[in-house]
Amino acid sequence: KYTPGSFVRTKLRRLILPFIVITTVTFVPRALFDSMSDEPFPLTLDNFGRSLVYQDCMPIPFFWFLQVSFIMLSLTFCVLYFSGSRRVRPAAVVLGLLFLAFLVAPIQVTPFLSIDRVRDFGFFFIAGCLYSLYSARIDRLIPWTDIRFLSASAAAWIGLFLLFEDSPLRFLCSLTGIAMCMSLARIMEERRWQFLDHLKAANYMIFLLSWYFNIAAQQVLAHFVALPWWVHTSLSLIAGIYIPWLGYKYLEKHQDNRLIRITSYILGQSFRKRA
């Protein structure tokens, strides 16, 4: 059973260690290829420091997700842990956090440590926690596997996106998009569509490393070779998924090697020990 200390340490290794290592390794090459990028990225010590703590300065733009995940997971676990020791029901705590997330959503906050993204996505994270508490009841009420529900949620998502893209009500678009994705996933599960199953263990590795191959296919290659846009996009998609997947498989196969274990550790990967 986790304590707050052990839980936070686990998430530091899983999320923050890969963030620091990969950001540091990526910083210099990203700055050297500044001329090929859409936005300036200077090779300075100040910019390096900012790239570790400000989400709008990161060399890999979507790595804010690691900081946000760490903050939300750690805070939520600690709040639930200490409220549980005082015999407060988890549902009451989660509802309180959900209300708090809704209240702070319009407030302007700093991008330091991706706090602004915590504000943006906190409501949806806590809503997911609430769903996990009552999933059995909710699933009885929502026809996830009905094609009509999938179609309706997809239509609502598109319509709300067009209506509220730059509106405070855009969170409705996100909710319908989440419902659409959940419905599609349930339909795939029910019909045993398993063509993506080979990727599931490597999804975190794909997230961590896909950016390199996306950039190589879309920007670096395009700088030297003029190909149709769909070729660059297809190469980016395939390389961004399957090269990290191959890397994961290699680490998994050679986990008895000390260097491989170290590499796996700093990338936040964990493999079951072989019998």
Map each language-model feature to its residues.
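Hydrophobic core of alpha-helical transmembrane segments in multi-pass integral membrane proteins
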Residues: 93-106, 148-162, 178-183, 236-249
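Alpha-helical transmembrane segments and terminal signal-anchor/GPI-anchor hydrophobic tails
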Residues: 118, 136-198, 205, 212-215, ...
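Solvent-exposed interhelical
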Residues: 73-98, 130-151
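Structural signal for the C-terminal ends of transmembrane alpha-helices
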Residues: 1-3, 78-85, 104-107, 127-139, ...
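C-terminal "closing" transmembrane helix and its immediate cytosolic amphipathic cap
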Residues: 188-200, 213-275
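Interfacial loop-to-helix transition and helix-capping segments at the boundaries
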Residues: 53-68, 106-127, 158-180
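Membrane-interface helix-loop-helix regions
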Residues: 14-74
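Juxtamembrane transmembrane-helix termini
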Residues: 1-11, 21-38, 213, 217-218, ...
